[in-house]
Amino acid sequence: MSKYFSEEFFKEVEGKLGGDPTWQQATKGVKSTIKLSTTDQGTSYLVTIDDGTTRIGKTDAAVQAEFSFEGTYEAWTKLAKGEVDLQSAVLKGHLRFRGSITKILFYKDRFVRIADIMKSVPLEF
């Protein structure tokens, strides 16, 4: 069991994405970066997508990414537990989004897969 929003957790997510044919097919030809940050714990992780390959690693909060989602650990926990979906969390202000709205809408179905994979990892909070 991984501690949520830890390096161990994100390495497990990275492995699951790497072994997920749906994700690999959906991200063929895609080059993007997504930063996921907790505002109250000061942790940030960078998801790097490059033509079907995905890497996730700890990063500095100042690092720029094409898309960024930030919120409290509690907000991320609600997402992990399925109490709220990513879109609702952003629309309700639980998570703050930065990046191109038009482009994220184009990638929406692909990126929702990351949230689904995150929910599939056995967690401790």
Regions found by a protein language model. Give the residues of each.
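Feature captures hydrophobic
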Residues: M1-F125
